[in-house]
């Protein structure tokens, strides 16, 4: 049977070969027009879409990275501002505390000075009153002594009356 194929192959005619060759070329042309061009166009479109998707993904990744950097910078800036605000508040509080303490010390000093003045005035008034009382008593004693010549008993009576007079005078 194999020998029939080999013998049959040698009996292939030129017309058949030409028909097969033309059929092959026409079939290739039809496949090229109907299938090959649309398939290659579809493959090229798909390759372009994939390339665009990759570019878009890279662009999105870069935008996300830039946005993350901006957020980090903003957060860092916010933290710095918050630290600055806290530091300013501490300074302001410290100044206010110092001012309040200084005012309190000045007020306490003023109260002390006023109290000293009041005490000195009271002391001066008391001294004047004592001097006045001593002068009055001295005048009264001198008047009584001048009116009477005193013996020891008279002196004792005068002293006792004077002491009683002091007790009444102070009450």
From Swiss-Prot:
It is found in: Cell membrane. The keyword Cytoplasm does not apply. GO terms for cellular component: plasma membrane; proton-transporting ATP synthase complex. Its main location: membrane. Gene3D superfamilies: F1F0 ATP synthase subunit B, membrane domain (1.20.5.620). F-type ATPases have 2 components, F(1) - the catalytic core - and F(0) - the membrane proton channel. F(1) has five subunits: alpha(3), beta(3), gamma(1), delta(1), epsilon(1). F(0) has three main subunits: a(1), b(2) and c(10-14). The alpha and beta chains form an alternating ring which encloses part of the gamma chain. F(1) is attached to F(0) by a central stalk formed by the gamma and epsilon chains, while a peripheral stalk is formed by the delta and b chains. F(1)F(0) ATP synthase produces ATP from ADP in the presence of a proton or sodium gradient. F-type ATPases consist of two structural domains, F(1) containing the extramembraneous catalytic core and F(0) containing the membrane proton channel, linked together by a central stalk and a peripheral stalk. During catalysis, ATP synthesis in the catalytic domain of F(1) is coupled via a rotary mechanism of the central stalk subunits to proton translocation. Component of the F(0) channel, it forms part of the peripheral stalk, linking F(1) to F(0). This is ATP synthase subunit b. It comes from Lactiplantibacillus plantarum (strain ATCC BAA-793 / NCIMB 8826 / WCFS1).
